[in-house]
Amino acid sequence: MKLEVRKARAAAVAANLAAQAAVAARELLEEEPSAWEVGDAAYWLCRAAQKACESAADALDPEEAETNADVFTAHLIAGRAAQEACDQADELVSLAEELNHEIRR
């Protein structure tokens, strides 16, 4: 398997895990609204994973994706995982606004 495909798949796994961390952080914040150190970390984790997925997907050859199922699939899963990480980060932003919290590094 090509290195670029492996990178895209690894980035997708990381983004999916980051999205799960964001969901867990939101659930924690519903119970304990002062636990923003976890929410902040999950937000930045999602953004970093999103960027990694986008970069890995961009590194794949679009012409090769037309004929190589591995490349096509890697591009697809990286794109979907990037979007999920983005969506979960946005959910944390919405919660932060609702609770009058500023997400910090």
Residue ranges and their predicted role:
Residues 1-105:
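Long, low-complexity or tandemly repetitive, helically biased scaffold regions used
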